[in-house]
């Protein structure tokens, strides 16, 4: 389960931002997860609930998760299409010359402080 490592990285980033901005308590964090990333949202939130117990600055901090749709670009016909629905082969022209544009990311979108 690599979600725990992801949570530790998120916590490190939050601690760094809090220190730079003289923040002592974080109320919530919003995370964007691409729908074809390898991060499983409910594993991430379970790990989050466990990990924040060890960080006073994050006591009671809620993690909000937003899923970003995966979009693929076709080099053959120059169109975008939904990756999960159609896979790697372009539904417009049948080309296999396709590239994932978005949907594999994991971002800290927003941090709410007290």
Spell out what each predicted region is.
Residues 82, 95-99:
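Short functional micro-motifs and their immediate structural scaffolds
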Residues 98-110:
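Short metal-binding segments enriched for Cys and/or His
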Residues 112-114:
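Short acidic/polar capping segments at secondary-structure boundaries
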Residues 33, 67, 110:
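Flexible glycine-/small-residue-rich
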Residues 72, 88, 106:
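Cys/His-enriched microdomains
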Residues 62-69, 79-84:
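Short, flexible, mixed-charge glycine/proline-rich loop motifs
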Residues 74-77, 90-93:
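Short cysteine-rich clusters marking metal-coordination/redox-active sites
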Residues 1-64:
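Long, charged N-terminal interaction/targeting segments
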């Amino acid at each position: 389960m690599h979600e725990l490592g992801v949570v530790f990285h998120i916590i490190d980033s939050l601690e760094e931002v809090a220190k730079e901005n003289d923040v002592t308590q974080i109320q919530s964090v919003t995370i964007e997860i691409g729908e074809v990333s390898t991060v499983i949202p409910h594993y991430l939130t379970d790990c989050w609930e466990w990990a924040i117990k060890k960080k006073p600055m994050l006591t009671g901090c809620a993690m909000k998760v937003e899923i970003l749709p995966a979009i693929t670009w076709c080099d053959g016909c120059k169109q975008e299409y939904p990756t999960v629905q159609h896979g790697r082969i372009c539904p417009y022209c049948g080309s296999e010359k396709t590239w994932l544009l978005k949907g594999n990311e994991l971002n800290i979108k927003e941090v709410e402080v007290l």
